[in-house]
């Protein structure tokens, strides 16, 4: 008997045989498990998802934001009041994610004013414009034409950093536009240098790219200024760090800016 059991085990039989034959094909199928109860639904009186905002509602909201910005900027009689107005302005969502307001740096009565696009990570940390790698290159560019950061005035279209250094949206630019326009009016520079394509297109209200705008004198106008300001568009230092071969073109722009400052032409 022991030898028979051993043979069964060696053959792979690991269950005991029934005393009587069993027709397993004739067995009733196992009962199906009861269906799980559907997830509980909200009570009929519970609030559903918020209704979608209609496009016309968004447009009205944006116009109200722009109007609020225009009114706040117009009330600023000097640079300090404009900074306070921007600090109190809640119409741009970038303020919620930024660490600091990046307002401006340099001489607010300078003949030469630089306007970039938006702060980067280092600018956001320090609360000053153009202090990262691109800012260091801008400092060298200024030195090359006999200027320093203290001789000029530097700011941006946007005073708050977009998350992840992404490009600003049209809505964000529109919300901040009245403030940069008032900023330029209060500084009243002899020459306005628009740093990068976003700055140039925003301030001039055009769609041409920076490569078509650089290399020539332009004109910046404001309804609140007695006369237009001579303007120049240059490649952004951040772009020059990525494309150093373009530094020559920017150097030619800087030479013309210097000549204009020296001769008053």
Spans of model-derived segments:
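A polyanion-binding, active-site-adjacent surface
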Residues: 2, 7-10, 14-26, 30-265
